[in-house]
């Protein structure tokens, strides 16, 4: 499909001119290049109809032709507002709703806010739609608390929306009088309805407030969360940690299949919503805490808390080394990493694999067709050091013991390095093997000088070598 806004430097859909199948192939290849070294990358999950999927829209008010109030989006790398009548990515009901907002605001003679002069009233309009419920929210962002003729505006908006065939569920005003790129202000007042809408996702109902974090592509979110819960291999007996949980969508989706769910989120309003969503859905085995995820899991791990499965869905900058260190201390059997940035995901997988986790699969999901963004669900399991593996041994001599046929010195060194980061010498390996009763050929541990000052294998390295020997079934 063609879009007139592309010629005006919209920048919202950089891949719109590319065939959708080619988009998917390019995104899948990107993930393979970044994550393929960790484990298999599954085929990307795309959409059947990759248009009109955005259930949330933010428009900025400006002055159009003839001084008429209009609204739109910022041009790429600019502060210029491009008027938008409709968008190939936005929910079509929300396109109609925005036209109604503009008409009602014009009727009330509201003026757009001018950042340079500090004059005018209307800054932005945020719209949400519950895809499954059809409920619509209008959030009007103003530069001052007083909305002149607020009741008349509400009446006019409901009338104009009705002309468009849209039933508005709630209207909220939020005040943002600061010089900032942040859209919503701190003060809110409900002008109509209850101040929130409902939507259904993966069998649960969620209350969405103006500030709620909620994935903008409903269809693909169900795919994403379905993959995440499947990757957890839940049996109903597990304690699950949902880190960076937002309003609790992943944790509550998993709650039906787990013994207990604990959600952690730094945004207090999101936690408030998560608790309310749990109550609304009758979920009694989920608890939510307002805390920094890294700090919370660090304290929990130090206190000896354990989790069988950890979901992690961090922001674009990814997780932290401290968080991953605490994951290793909690030693969950499985980790499911939901990522919106494959670059930071690759960085974090490097740390997780060093901590004894194996990447079973990475599955990209096209949450944002026609953009360059990629979501990925990565399934990890804790390596079992007693797991039996097949080793292809290259025998350099025939005179070896039964134990020596299990693994070469090089393989033992590589195992220790990969799982602990430690470098161990053949001398240290020989010393530990001798302690374990494994017969050595004389040249490995025999000193070359008389009265030698023999180096003793440090305790930390001895433990690591013993783990390697156990892994290779040598002790």
Task: Enumerate the language-model features and the residues they cover.
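Phospho-regulated, low-complexity intrinsically disordered regions of nuclear gene-regulatory
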Residues: 454-475
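Extended interfacial segments that mediate partner engagement and assembly in macromolecular machines
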Residues: 11-112, 127, 132, 146-147
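DNA-recognition alpha helix
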Residues: 408-420, 430-436
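Short cysteine clusters
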Residues: 3-6, 10-13, 340
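Short, aliphatic-rich beta-strand segments
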Residues: 127, 134-143, 205-209, 309
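Rossmann-like S-adenosyl-L-methionine
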Residues: 148-401, 409-410
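Short, charged amphipathic recognition helices of the HTH superfamily
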Residues: 401-414, 425-426, 440
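Short Lys/Arg-enriched helix C-cap and helix-to-coil transition segments
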Residues: 440-450
């Amino acid at each position: 499909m063609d879009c007139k806004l592309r010629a005006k430097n919209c920048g919202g859909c950089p891949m719109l001119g590319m065939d959708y199948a080619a988009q998917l192939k390019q995104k899948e290849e990107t993930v393979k290049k970044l994550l393929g070294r960790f484990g298999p990358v599954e085929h990307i999950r795309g959409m059947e109809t990759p248009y009109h999927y955005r259930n949330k829209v933010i428009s900025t008010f400006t002055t159009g032709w003839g001084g008429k109030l209009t609204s739109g989006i910022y041009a790429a790398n600019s502060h210029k507002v491009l008027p938008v009548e409709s968008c190939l990515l936005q929910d079509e009901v929300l396109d109609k709703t925005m036209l109604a907002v503009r008409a009602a605001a014009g009727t009330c003679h509201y003026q757009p806010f001018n950042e340079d002069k500090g004059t005018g009233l209307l800054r932005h309009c945020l719209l949400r739609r519950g895809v499954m419920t059809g409920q619509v929210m209008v959030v009007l962002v103003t530069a001052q608390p007083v909305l002149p003729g607020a009741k008349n505006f509400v009446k006019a908006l409901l009338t104009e929306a009705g002309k468009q065939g849209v039933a508005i569920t709630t209207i909220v005003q939020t005040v943002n009088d600061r010089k900032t790129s942040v859209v919503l202000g701190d003060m809110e007042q409900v002008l109509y309805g209850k101040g929130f809408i409902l939507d259904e996702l993966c069998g649960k109902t969620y209350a969405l407030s103006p500030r709620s974090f909620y994935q903008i592509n409903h269809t693909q979110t169900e795919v994403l969360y379905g993959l995440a819960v499947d990757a957890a291999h839940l049996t109903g007996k597990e304690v699950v940690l949902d880190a960076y949980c937002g309003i609790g969508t992943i944790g509550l989706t998993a709650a039906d299949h787990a013994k207990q769910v604990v959600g952690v989120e730094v945004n207090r309003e999101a936690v408030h919503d998560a608790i309310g969503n749990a109550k609304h859905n009758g979920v009694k085995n989920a608890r939510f805490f307002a805390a920094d995820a890294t700090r919370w899991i660090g304290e929990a791990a130090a206190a000896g808390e354990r989790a069988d499965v950890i979901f992690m869905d961090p922001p674009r900058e990814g997780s932290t080394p401290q968080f991953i260190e605490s994951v290793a201390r909690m030693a969950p059997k499985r980790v499911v990493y939901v990522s919106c940035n494959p670059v930071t995901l690759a960085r974090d997988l490097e740390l997780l694999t060093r901590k004894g986790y194996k990447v079973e699969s990475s599955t990209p999901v096209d949450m944002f067709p026609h953009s360059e963004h990629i979501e990925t669900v990565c399934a990890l399991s804790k390596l079992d050091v007693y797991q039996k593996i097949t080793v292809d041994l290259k025998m350099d001599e025939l005179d070896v013991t039964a134990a020596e046929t299990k693994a070469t010195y090089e393989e033992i060194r590589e195992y220790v390095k990969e799982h602990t980061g430690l470098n161990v010498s053949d001398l240290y390996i020989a010393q530990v093997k001798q302690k374990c009763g494994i017969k050595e050929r004389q040249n490995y541990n025999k000193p070359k000088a008389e009265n030698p000052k023999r180096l003793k294998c440090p305790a930390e390295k001895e433990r690591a070598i013993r783990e390697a020997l156990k892994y290779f079934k040598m002790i």
